[in-house]
Regions:
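Conserved N-terminal glycine-rich FAD pyrophosphate-binding loop of Rossmann-like flavoproteins
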Residues: 105-128, 471-492
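Structural detector for internal amphipathic alpha-helices that build alpha-solenoid repeat scaffolds
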Residues: 792-805, 809-833, 841, 852-877, ...
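Flavin (FAD/FMN)-binding glycine-rich loop and adjacent Rossmann-like elements that form
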Residues: 55-68, 111, 123-135, 151-152, ...
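Short beta-strand to alpha-helix junction loop
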Residues: 139-153, 340, 490-501
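Amphipathic alpha-helical scaffolding segments comprising HEAT/armadillo-like alpha-solenoid repeats
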Residues: 777-787, 804-816, 832-855, 877-891, ...
Length: 1003
């Protein structure tokens, strides 16, 4: 590697490449062992002439044939988010085309914001309408841009023009019609894979990935190294170029073929030279480089001087032999000097307007016909252009893969799981996914749990890769909601825990890091997960591992692999609030459905609109507290917490108080088993975490760490603290390496040495190691009888309920002889209807009392009236309906009625009696209850005083539908919410509607 001094152009030799690994023989043994493992899944060596750079591979894994859901049908699809594509989208949309932009980041643009190149060069003078609108007040001299304002301005321009866009979506394939012409793109994101049908595609990726996937070819890659650069804000890097507070520094990185691992290695080399991570500072998410190759296009511009956007031959942007595709960026057929200009925002934007006009005309003229396309010349051509072909398919690879035991598993539920009108599917034939690497341990997610997992495994001698979706390490701890609140104050988490220090430790441990790499699938051999499918701006690739650790925070790999999970709690609208830094100082906002692409995109856009307008930049992530909760071999519930349940496979301890950031949903909490709250215990309480809660049920080779481990919603509120997740990740990484080294599986690994090590470093105490690494026994009959005498005691109630159906005979007898409210509640929790009449009469005898208005930290107690209304729904006995209806009629429509309404509508909905339908419909017809659907996206809808209105409307409508509905009112409301921008409302409404059709809800 050589360092390039941008100011002088001088080079100096720093060290040889590649660096020699310490303990070379051991490392080589690990590599040989890993590739021996690969042989077991029957990979096939193939050659493929048409693969994009970065997809060249000698090993491939099979992706069997499947149907992909269609997420959109548009006239023009823009892939990538540089200023050229944005200007083209803006221009075409204003001319009348339907346009969708998909970009891999959570913001625009790829060449300015993503690289933190927030300046205009002195010769950049806006000429076009779009560039003048964006830059008019910023041009002149070397003007610098304010990151937050720049991102907002782009989004405002696109939204005003009617352009739709999806963030965090990357291209993975192309669609073709019967004639073999491009008719759309396959995208990957946190919702899985989707197809977008389009008449014209504008490819703004730096490598022309869409064009290459469609068969375009490039000039030869004939260099061994490439100059790469990176920008840091507020720092001076030796040899760098200073532009205001920005510093761009460069080096020459080895890159003999441009593969994705080589590009990621270049990212690491740049960060080894200088690394600084600060979520609200405009640091680069990715490196800058000029590709040494270009596409072969219909024309080529060989001059070194930029001719101007109005003079460049547009044939330079048309890949040879690939109609209906434009390349708009440095992949165009131009000299590499001009390619540099095509990474600058003003030239790109001005050229983009020309291409936008041309693309609009071409889309209007393209008419789909069976077997191909014909140009439209008749007056009815525009109407015919809206007809879509029935013969679309994903373009197959040049070579097919022979039958293999391993296969790729994807999420195929669509970009919005319960979208009202299906756009259909397109067939994907069997494909070959290139393998980009193989490791002992693959950690997906370089955040709070992922970094310690990788360090622990690597320090035990494992060959480890971190796959990170963003361009920075740190995850939610560093980039979403920074800081600590409670947590177990011992062990690995006591290390100085910042992303910069973590990066240095990872490199010292020889951990590879792949930035800007999205996990979009799993490689499976039967029920064993043996790799991950990745999406990048080069397309798809796979990395294989003996153990995969899902540290995504959202259980993305687990979900793709087919693991079961709870999400929005399976039909109960209950999810902890998110936080978006800089909306307020520490704003709690609407919970985010990360697997709804439209909602995820709008959440970021609206948070920027609603937030403080004078901030320098925004944190790159919405700080999520809860998304998917995986169903592991054991699901920790509040009974386990109250009893302090221990496990023979104990590997971590959480220490916190109950901190729901919303409300509870467990029958156990309503029965009286709320864990100690932050008002009851300042230091917190212990929850013991077993290995089995990190093992997704039915899957081998896979561990899940972070906030999505196998717990219930109400437990998760006290085990998701950053300090605890650091220790949890470390334990998982250490366990993975130990299992590999000993030749065991994750379920058969010897736990004693692992627990000894965790006690040695303080992750668990020595007392825990000696006394609590055992399974708590099941309650004895004597203990169950004793519990009946004191059900006001949380431990005694928990003991009784842990007994399950064994507790029922004694509980029934005790209630019959001496009925009490506590015994009646316990019977209901266990699903027994013996106390329903007693509770209904008790409810009628009680005033409704004061309820609790919605507030993020308000629900730290359960009044008896609300407890009874909720629990009466558990046995599903219609004798409770009349009393519940009378309480519903006493409720107000908002404010402090929120907690009452949640409890009573839940009770009625679970019983599902038609006798309650009229009362629920009457409630919905009260003034102010209906009409809170938000399709377009009001920035204020992020705030609790607004979204709580939708909560109440949805609680009542969901209960009404479950009770059989009344004049179609409930279904009409839920159907309307299927178009709401807020994904959690779409998911809840869709789940309730699906219950009645037998189509089911979540896994």
């Amino acid at each position: 590697m050589t360092e390039t001094h941008l100011a002088t152009g001088k080079h100096r030799q720093e060290h040889a490449w590649p660096p020699r690994a310490e303990g070379g023989d051991a490392r080589n043994d690990r590599v040989r062992g890993t590739w021996a493992f690969l042989a077991s899944i029957a990979l096939l060596a193939l050659a493929s002439a048409g693969q994009p750079a970065g997809l060249a591979a000698e090993r491939w894994v099979r992706s069997s044939a499947r149907d992909l859901p269609v997420s959109a049908r548009v006239d023009i699809l823009v892939v990538g988010g540089n200023e050229g594509g944005l200007a083209a989208a803006w221009t075409a949309a204003r001319a009348g085309s339907t346009v969708l932009v998909v970009t891999g980041n959570y913001f625009f643009s790829d060449d300015v914001s993503a690289k933190a190149r927030y300046w205009l060069e002195p010769d950049e003078v806006p000429q076009g309408e779009f560039s003048r609108a964006l830059f008019a007040e910023r041009s002149g001299g070397r003007a610098t841009l304010t990151p937050a304002q720049y991102k907002r301005d782009i989004e405002d321009l696109l939204l005003d023009a009617g352009v739709a866009f999806h963030f965090n979506s990357k291209p993975t394939g192309v669609l073709v019609d019967g004639a073999g012409h491009v008719a759309g793109v396959v995208t990957a994101n946190k919702a899985g894979l989707q197809a977008v049908i389009a008449k014209v595609v504008i490819d703004t990726t730096p490598t022309g990935t869409v064009a290459r996937l469609a068969g375009a070819v490039t000039t030869p890659w004939s260099v061994q190294q490439v100059q790469v650069s990176r920008v840091s804000y507020g720092a001076r890097v030796p040899g760098g170029r200073q532009i205001g507070e920005f510093c761009e520094y460069a080096l020459d990185a080895p890159m003999p073929d441009g593969s994705w691992p080589q590009r990621c290695r270049a990212e690491v080399l740049l960060r080894e030279k200088h690394d600084r991570v600060d979520g609200k500072r405009a640091h680069a998410q990715c490196l800058h480089m000029i590709e040494p190759v270009c596409l072969r296009t219909e024309a080529y511009e060989a001059a070194d001087r930029w001719p101007g956007a109005d003079q460049l031959d547009l044939g330079c942007c048309l890949p040879a032999g690939v109609p209906y595709v434009y390349v708009l960026g440095q992949a165009a057929g131009v000299s590499r000097s001009i390619a540099e200009q095509l990474t600058r925002p003003v030239p790109l934007a001005d050229l983009g307007e020309r291409i936008g006009r041309r693309a609009h005309q071409q889309a209007a003229a393209r008419v789909w016909v069976t077997g191909g396309l014909t140009p439209a010349r008749s007056p009815g051509a525009q109407a015919a252009a809206r007809d879509w072909p029935s013969d679309l398919a994903v373009r197959p690879d040049a070579a097919a893969v022979a039958d293999a035991e391993a296969d790729v598993s994807d999420l195929l539920t669509g970009h919005r799981r319960y979208v009202r009108s299906s756009l259909g599917t397109v067939p994907q034939p069997e494909l070959a996914i290139p393998v980009w690497g193989a490791y002992d341990v693959v950690v997906v997610g370089g955040g709070t749990s992922g970094i310690p997992a990788a360090l622990a495994a690597a320090r035990q001698g494992a060959k480890v890769l971190i796959v990170e979706m963003l361009g920075q390490l740190g995850g939610n701890r560093e980039l979403g909601t920074p800081g600590y609140w409670k947590g177990y104050p011992y062990g690995f988490n006591q290390w100085k825990w910042r992303a910069v220090e973590a990066f240095a430790e990872l490199r010292q441990a020889d951990v590879d890091i792949w930035y800007n790499t999205l996990a979009c699938g799993a490689v499976k051999q039967a029920d064993r997960v043996c790799g991950v499918v990745l999406a990048t701006h080069l397309g798809r690739g796979a990395v294989l591992g003996q153990v995969v650790i899902d540290a995504t925070g959202d259980a993305d790999v687990c979900a793709a692999a087919g693991a079961g999970f709870a999400y929005v709690n399976d039909g109960d609208l209950c999810l902890q609030e998110a936080s978006f830094r800089d909306v307020d100082l520490y704003a709690n906002v609407l919970p985010l459905d990360h697997a709804d692409v439209h909602s995820l995109t709008m959440h970021h856009v609206l948070a920027r609109k609603a937030g403080k307008q004078d901030v320098w930049d925004y944190y790159p992530l919405v700080g999520l507290r809860e998304t998917r909760l995986v169903r592991g071999d054991h699901v920790i519930d509040v009974i386990d917490q109250i009893l302090g349940r221990t496990y023979r496979d104990l590997i971590s301890v959480s220490w916190s108080a109950y901190d729901p950031h919303g409300y509870h949903n467990s029958d156990l909490v309503y029965a009286g088993l709320m864990p100690p709250t932050k008002h009851e215990t300042k230091p917190g309480f212990a929850t013991y975490i077993p290995l089995r809660s990190l093992l997704p049920q039915g899957l081998d080779g896979l561990l899940v760490v972070g906030r999505c481990l196998s717990v219930t919603h109400d437990v998760q509120a006290s085990v998701r603290m950053n300090a605890d997740l650091i220790n949890l990740g470390y334990a998982a990484g250490y366990t993975a390496a130990h299992a590999i080294r000993s030749g065991a599986t994750l379920r058969t690994v010897e736990l004693g040495p692992i627990q000894d090590h965790l006690a040695e470093i303080g992750n668990i105490s020595r007392e825990d190691r000696l006394q609590r690494c055992v399974d708590s026994p099941e309650p004895t009959d004597a203990e169950l009888r004793a519990a009946l005498d004191d059900l006001e005691s949380k431990p005694q109630l928990a003991m009784l309920l842990r007994g399950g159906r064994r507790s029922l005979p004694g509980l029934r007898a005790a209630f019959a002889s001496a009925p009490t409210l506590a015994k009646a509640k316990a019977l209901c929790v266990l699903g027994d209807a013996a106390a329903v009449e007693y509770l209904a009469a008790w409810l009628d005898s009680q005033p409704l009392g004061a309820g609790t208005a919605y507030q993020w930290d308000a629900f730290l107690a359960v009044p008896d009236v609300e407890s009874v209304m909720w629990l009466l729904g558990v046995p599903r006995d219609e004798r409770a309906v009349a009393a519940l209806v009378r309480k519903l009629q006493q409720c107000g429509t908002g404010g402090t009625s929120f907690s009452h309404l949640r409890a009573v509508t839940s009770g009625l909905g679970r019983i599902g009696s038609p006798a309650a339908a009229a009362a629920l419909a009457d409630f919905l017809r009260r003034p102010g209850v209906q009409g809170h659907v938000d399709v377009r996206g009001d920035p204020q809808s992020l705030r609790s005083d607004q979204f709580v209105k939708s909560y109440i409307e949805l609680f009542a409508a969901g209960a009404l539908v479950r009770c059989g509905d009344c004049d179609g009112l409930g279904r009409a409301i839920l159907n309307a919410y299927l178009e709401d921008w807020r994904g959690i409302f779409v998911r809840y409404a869709g789940h309730v509607l699906a219950e009645g059709t037998g189509s089911g809800g979540e896994k």
